[in-house]
Amino acid sequence: MKFFVVFVMAVAYSKLYELIKNVKDEKEAEELCKIIEEFFEKQCKENVSKKFEEQKPVLKLELKEELRKELTTKEDLELIGEKILRYVDNKINQVIEKINQLDKKIDEGFYQLDKKVDTLKRDIIIIALIIILANYAPSIIGKILSFLK
């Protein structure tokens, strides 16, 4: 289609050139040139305007589609929000798990410490008994031996 339009325009220009060449008066030729230029300019503007109006819906759709691809949509924001919530939830669960692990270690540490304190108490009691009984040991041993005789 474009080739045909270009061909018709080329033929029209060549015929107009021949017509202008035959005009003897220079002012008339210039005036004729101006009229022809104005005519083609007007035709060109009308054609461009007409083509633009025809292409306007297509261009609008293309522009909308391009903007849709480039701009963030509500769905995209919702997806990003969901991803962020999942990420934060995952991190919170990891922190809770670490807190539980530390709590378990603390409980084990207190249990071990409690066992050591109990052992230390027992050892102190035994040492105290040994010290106390050490003063009375000779008399106690004597009494035990006297019962055996």
From Swiss-Prot:
Membrane topology recorded in Swiss-Prot or TrEMBL: Single-pass membrane protein
Alphabetized UniProt keyword annotations: Membrane, Transmembrane, Transmembrane helix
Any one GO cellular component localisation term in the record: membrane
Cell location: Membrane
Principal location listed in the UniProt entry: membrane
Domain of life according to the entry: Archaea
Chain segments annotated as transmembrane: 124-144
Family: Belongs to the M.jannaschii MJ0023/MJ0349/MJ1072/MJ1074/MJ1107/MJECL16 family.
Protein name: Uncharacterized protein MJ1107
